[in-house]
Amino acid sequence: MKVILLGAPGAGKGTQAQFIMHKFGIPQISTGDMFRAAIKEGTELGKQAKALMDQGKLVPDDLTVALVKDRIAQPDCAHGFLLDGFPRTIPQADALKDAGVKIDLVLEFDVADEVIVERMSGRRVHQPSGRTYHIIYNPPKVAGQDDITGEELITRADDKAETVLERLAVYHQQTKPLIAYYIAEAEKGNTRYERLDGTKPVEQVSAELANIFNQ
């Protein structure tokens, strides 16, 4: 099963990707991880990507698609893969299609912006240990303090409300058009499109995913 995950940052894609990987034995492919691996291995594509990144330039779509094609040709992808964080734009989706990569299933995690802001801006972290809390869903015993050490909890820069809103604006501008793109592809019979309510409890979303994969 070749799967694309769509959804705003904080919609729960990462949590459910872990569930799918463990339950169905499909590797998760993140373009960020791929670039890091290609650069570390010193592959030709890795060298090209590194040269651009070192200059602060964006890696062009054709190079990213070439890297994705390389990665999905590896033996662990024989039974499928999960693409997370790619494609992000319509040109990238077109490039993937033109490269002959057939997608079986597109999963959209649908969560309203205000819920995402509440989820992410409510996170608190104990930096030394990495323990995470949430002021509503998983509060520490004493507000602002780590349960074990009593040390101060912080809000990561990425989780601050204004940063979350900026990331959501980019998502709506760049990536949301992909939802219409893949719904149209599904209507043509080129893929299957499923929308999940990301506000439901994690276990419920996982159960719905298992049903989708078993259909």
UniProtKB/Swiss-Prot annotation:
Pathway: Purine metabolism; AMP biosynthesis via salvage pathway; AMP from ADP: step 1/1. It holds the Pfam family ADK_lid. It is found in: Cytoplasm. ATP binds at G10, A11, G12, K13, G14, T15, R123, T132, Y133, K200. SUPFAM superfamilies: P-loop containing nucleoside triphosphate hydrolases (SSF52540). Its main location: cytoplasm. It comes from the Bacteria. Residues 30-59 are annotated as: NMP. GO terms for biological process: AMP salvage. One of its GO terms (molecular function) is ATP binding. GO terms for cellular component: cytoplasm. Catalyzes the reversible transfer of the terminal phosphate group between ATP and AMP. Plays an important role in cellular energy homeostasis and in adenine nucleotide metabolism. Monomer. NCBIfam families: adk, PRK00279.1-1, PRK00279.1-2, PRK00279.1-3. Belongs to the adenylate kinase family. Consists of three domains, a large central CORE domain and two small peripheral domains, NMPbind and LID, which undergo movements during catalysis. The LID domain closes over the site of phosphoryl transfer upon ATP binding. Assembling and dissambling the active center during each catalytic cycle provides an effective means to prevent ATP hydrolysis. This is Adenylate kinase. It comes from Haemophilus ducreyi (strain 35000HP / ATCC 700724). The gene is adk.
